[in-house]
Each structure stands twice: as C-alpha cells, then as structure tokens.
C-alpha cells in the first residue's frame, strides 16, 4: 500500500475529468433526478494540513467520515439509531448481563489479505485504553476513549478478552444496554494497530495520502460486502469552509460536507446539478439555567417563565435559517429512544407563550415596572430590577450564537426581563460554566455515541453545568445501568427464546430513557433549543440512508449506483 506521494496535479486532473463528464452526461430538471453516479467521485474535506491518518485519534469531522469507508466496527446504527451487526455477526449476554459475547464474522479480511479475528478487536481496544490514559486533553484521545474511561471518568467497559479466533468477551460492572453503542469503533489489525494508515476491512482502501492535498481511496475488490460501484474516491483537502465551498461552486469536487452558515443558500435547491441533504449532529444547543441556591433562576417558575418567553421558531428562521432541528428534549426525534413531551403534571406545556411567562413572573412578585419597562419589585433594600446575565461563547468562524443571544435578549425584554449580554472565548466560557458564575448561558453539549445523559443530569456529573440536583433523576440515571427484573420470565420462556435477557435489557433501556425524559421535562433544569444540522452538497445522489449523521456522512456510498 502506498501512503504518501507528491500528487500536485490531482485537483487539475479532477477538473478535466468533470469537464469531460459534463459534456457526456445529460442534464436533468429535478434535484431528485440528477445525473447518474459516476465510477469516480471527489469529496471535499476541511482539515489541517498536518492531520495524521490514524482512525482512533482522528477527530476531524470530515476525515472521520472519509475514514469510515476504510474502517468498520463490530456494531453500527440503523436509521432509527438502533444497534445492528456489522463486523460482529451476532452477540449475546451472560452473567446476568455483565458479560457480552460477540461472535465475529469469519469471512472478513484486512486490505493486506490477513483475516480478521477477535484478537484484532482486542488489540484495538487495548490501543483505545492506552490513548485514554496517556493524554490529559480530550481532543488527543480520539472519539472512543469513553469506552474504557480513565481516572476521572468511568468507562462503559471494565475488561475484554478474545477467547478464540472469532469470539470476544466484554465484561462490565453492571448490566447496561449502552455497551452496544460503545462497540462502535474502527477495528484495526493487531500487527499494525499503532501505525499510521493501518489497513482496514472496509469497502475502500487507502491508495495514497498527500498531506494537505489528497487522500485517495480505491475500491476493495475483496470486501466481504458487495463490490463498490464507485471504484475510486479522491478526498481533496481545503483549509477553510469558504475555500471548500468555492471549490464546489467551481465544480472541482462532487461532494462537500459542511456546517458552514455560508452553505445555507444551497438548502432546498432544486437544480439539475446539485442535491442538498441535511445531516444531523450530536451537538445540542441549550440555554443553560443556573439551578444553584441563591441564583435568580433557582425557582422552577422563573425557569419556566424564561422558557415560555423564548420563541424557538423565530430563532430557527431568523438566525439559523432552518439548519437546526427544534427540540424540547435531550433525545432526537425519529430515534427509537425518543419520547414526546405532553402536558406536565402541573399543567405546564412546553412552547412559546408570552402570556404564561408574564403570569409566572407576576406570581413570583415581579409585578412592578421601572421607567424603562423592565420588571421590578420592592425589597428591604429598595426597588430591584429583574436583571439576568446572559452569556455565550464564540464559535470560530460562526456568529450565529451571538445573533441568537441578541434575539433571546429581545424576547426576554418583551416580558420585562432585563439582560446584560457578554461574550467569552470557548476556554473562558467553559470556566464560567464550571464555576457557576452566570444566570443564563447559551452553549452546546456534544453528546457521545452512547445515549446516556448521566454526565449532564447526575448531581455530580462532570457536565452538569446547570447545577441540577434531583434525587429522583439520580435514581433514574442509576437505573439505566441496572439489570431488568427477571422474576416474571418462566423457564419455558427462557428455553424458547435464548435471547430473552438481551430483549429485556433493550426494552428496559428504552423505558428508562422515557422516564428520564419525563423527569427532565418536569424539572426543566435547562432549555434544550435545537440540534445543530449540517448540509451535504452533492452533484450526484450517493446515499440511500434516511438518517444521514455526522461522522458517518458517506455511509452506503459504496452500494449506491
């Protein structure tokens, strides 16, 4: 395998290819009827020039999506985000759910011809553990370190071993269905697990890599799945989103994956040369509310008054122009774990309602107004105006969060709440959140692959910036990792269904998530606003996936034709 060579003419050859292709392929009138998929594709990647190609340390969104064509995992997600088999043919649980036994496919080969075994999976997990412990910076650990955790954060898995060539045992401290999500990491060959550009098992293999220019892939003719129709893919590197967008407009690339606000103009385009697909991310934009004792947002009525005053629809249309998905929960709609929120036990219903906001503020005693129209009340220290600190942190190359903060300031002013808006760098903003020195904070959570909100809702969770405390919620979160009740399962039922315990664990996981969603809605510790989306711009339809997800943006391209 060749990894690095000088290939400065790659982009020029690609442009000539597209020019010839444009003369040969007929133009069509609808975005859903664009030209037939060619056997060669060019993908744009925005990434640093010196990026290394190790799949376990890569964190660049575009690069991870491209490497997803080279490397595969034991488990992947379907369109409902349920775990399904990939390199693992099947699995089962033993020891009351604390031992997971994965059966590896016996017909899978690495790109260098060596057969995949369970010992390769074990070696890959060993590397992940070493990465998790070696670096203090999360961005140096890769995307998968929470699988095993470190001294500060508990991992999902305790230990693992290969018991034969095609059997991997994974051991946990407690029964937990989330283990399946944790097993979604790229599998490497034991002999080359620490090497840069190690061979994978995926539908494409790396032909060569010129840092800062081109990552060239060619189809894996010995793939265990269907032989890829698109025989070669060149991923061309760009320094900025604007540079990549310009390349797309110049027809130098066929596919561009981007979260840049500049790509908004392409959304919904009906063209004979362009398709645009929205893709989902794991970034949840929130308005953090300080639940600390003594905070003005400690009272549930105050938090709900603020929530009722915010018009999410207006934020989405005026600021984000539709490149987000509105939510009231911390779980995405359309997934198997999603549960809709109805009317709560006290009659409250999520949604924009300024009349309800005004009524709640009146109940709290903020029923007077100063000469500027802001709410106030008389205290022993005199008249006090209702003033809240609204903070946000900047996102590189993106002013949308600033615009959203100013819109929220206007919305709160409409119900008489005065706010002072302050901007911080990401580092300083994170320090403010951790210290609790804020009233309102416009920020974002990046959720892990494993759907588990313990980190942000448990009383001592490392991401519990709202300083939320609830014994009920803590019990629900702990129950998420407990074994299901098995007393009601008869011996006959156990014999007839060997996977009975796994089914119980799956059903309990969903039920527990529903209870967590309900409790979160009742307590309203912070306000989920929307999930960030991105856009895939393409000149050819390339995917049959309904749920196109960040980090997996090229999934199924090998089978599309």
Spell out what each predicted region is.
Residues 299-410, 515:
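Append "and occasionally in soluble cytosolic enzymes with long acidic Gly/Pro-rich linkers
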